[in-house]
Design a protein with these regions (language model features):
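Flavin (primarily FAD) binding-site architecture
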Residues: 212-227
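Extreme N-terminal leader/targeting segments of oxidoreductases
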Residues: 1-18, 33-36
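Dinucleotide-binding Rossmann-like beta1-alpha1 core, especially the glycine-rich loop
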Residues: 59-142
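Glycine-rich FAD pyrophosphate-binding loop
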Residues: 35-56
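C-terminal catalytic lobe of FAD-dependent flavoproteins
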Residues: 174, 230-243, 247-273, 279-401, ...
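Short hydrophobic core segments
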Residues: 20-21, 205-215
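Glycine-rich Rossmann-fold phosphate-binding loop(s) that bind the pyrophosphate
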Residues: 23-24, 28, 46
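Helical element adjacent to the flavin cofactor pocket in flavoenzyme catalytic cores
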Residues: 155-194, 198-208
Length: 469
């Protein structure tokens, strides 16, 4: 029987402990934690797993230097703890340490002594060795495109980067490996009665608890339970631009624009990721446009600290879920809001990629789940990274790429290529992804379309527009 058909039948027949609505990083993290606690779980998403915010972030796992400036020391401390856990235990193949430079220009918003003090405090909270000021010559060795004109010095500190979509998928895989029903293209249709619309049919679901982790759609789901529910959040649009470059960078760049906003230049997947914008968004979360004005803003802000920016290869936009309130989105607190509706459905709004594990554990607490272990668990592929017996011959760059995306599960990805060497051909020109990854995405990772494969399960989309499998 087809795996998807089997999952739909199980959704209709099993009596569940928990239905998780939303397959972004928070929903996937909740499903992972709940299955580890022994719960019978179903995870559904109306689109694809990591189909929205969770594949459209700045790709950073970080303490949040700007949150220290806003006085949110608790959030910074918690985020740094989670960064270390993700790097060292949960997903060391996906979450990797990266130095960051914070340039100090003559006309910049901060004085060097202020930044140096902040970096020392930040690095102390991070338990990191890198902190303090470096001269222009060393900074230019780390970031060759750094604009030297007017540059007084750079602060140096440490954070981490990731592939956000694959981190989300690893959590989905962990939940599925423990028996969770996982279905993308499955939308919550009703709360009372509890029904899910999937493949043109409406399936009645029996679940003792429901958690709404629908990200930008969290209030839409709340209104299915209570049409009079007041808004719990607001949305902020973040646009990123991917350009050529970054392959010779040994550090990322944090560019201050005023005393609230920064933007980033991050060497990522062989490219350079620039961004992000932060503007209030009141449109349809299903279609978040990237305008020429958005792209121009990102490039202009990057040019404050970079010279010779390469050609644009891709753009994308995502939505941050922020607590409701007054004031600009850039200064809004990145906190998580939990609410419980009249039928007992718990809704989770907001949060950070870095702290998704903490949010998941807190959500289970709000659901009344007791005895949940807070000990971090390695995700699938996170162990045995130094003991991989590669089943086929590959160059070192391709091995490194697969090891990053899949960890030790790269062996599973490559196994069919033992009998079919054509699977070792490039998936698209100019990227290290292989045809074997396309097959694996469709047979093991719930990919239902070319976009699912190219955009969220591989890095093939970085080859440019018009790419098809």
């Amino acid at each position: 029987m087809d795996e998807r058909v089997r999952a739909i039948e199980q959704l209709a027949s099993r009596e569940l402990d928990l239905l998780v609505v939303g397959g972004g990083i928070v929903g996937a993290g909740i499903a992972e934690a709940a299955t580890a606690a022994g719960l019978d779980v179903a995870l559904v998403d109306k689109g694809d797993f990591a189909g929205a915010t969770s594949s459209a972030s700045s790709k950073l796992v970080h303490g949040g230097l700007r949150y220290l400036r806003l006085g949110d020391v608790g959030l910074v401390r918690e985020a740094h703890h989670e960064r270390r856990v993700l790097m060292n235990i949960v997903a060391p193949h996906l979450v990797r340490r990266l130095p960051f430079l914070f340039p100090l220009y003559d006309n910049g918003p901060y004085r060097p002594w202020f930044v140096q003090t902040g970096i020392v405090v930040y690095s102390t909270l991070a338990r990191a060795r890198l902190n303090g000021l470096v001269d222009v010559e060393r900074a230019r060795r780390l970031v060759p495109q750094l604009q030297p004109r007017g540059l007084r010095a750079c602060a140096l500190y440490e954070d981490a980067w990731t592939n956000d979509g694959r981190l989300t998928l690893a959590n989905v895989r962990a939940a599925a490996d423990r028996g969770a029903i996982v279905l993308n293209g499955a939308e919550l249709a009703s709360v009372q009665p509890l029904e899910v619309r999937v493949d043109g049919n409406v399936v009645r679901v029996r679940a003792r608890r429901v958690v709404n982790a629908a990200g930008p759609w969290v209030d839409h789901v709340r209104r299915l339970e209570d049409p009079a529910a007041r808004p719990s959040m607001r949305l902020s649009k973040g646009v990123h631009v991917v350009v050529d470059g970054g392959d010779h960078w040994s550090a990322a760049l944090t560019i201050p624009h005023d005393k609230v906003r920064v933007s980033f230049g991050v060497p990522w997947e062989g490219m350079l990721l620039l961004g992000t914008t932060d503007t209030e968004y009141t449109g349809d979360p299903d279609t978040v446009p990237v305008s020429d004005t958005d792209v121009r803003q990102v490039l202009d802000e990057a040019a404050v600290a970079l010279e010779d920016i390469g050609p644009v290869r891709a753009t994308f936009a995502g939505l941050r879920v922020l607590p409701g309130g007054e004031g600009g989105t850039a200064s809004a607190r990145r906190e998580t809001v939990f609410s419980t509706g009249p039928t007992g459905m718990v809704s989770v709004a907001g949060g950070k990629l870095t702290t998704y594990r903490r949010i998941a554990l807190d959500a289970l607490g709000h659901l009344g789940v007791r005895g949940v272990s807070r000990r971090p668990r390695p995700l699938p592929g996170a162990t045995g990274l130094d003991r991989i017996d590669w089943p086929v011959e590959l160059d070192s760059a391709t091995r490194a790429h697969l090891l990053h995306l899949y960890g030790s599960l790269a062996i599973e990805v490559l196994q069919p290529a033992v009998d079919d060497p054509s699977l070792l051909e490039p998936l698209v020109p100019g990227r290290p992804d292989l045809r074997a990854q396309d097959l694996y995405a469709r047979t093991h990772e719930w990919a239902r379309s070319d976009e699912d494969v190219l955009r969220r399960r591989t890095t093939a989309w970085l080859a440019g527009a018009g790419i098809r499998v």
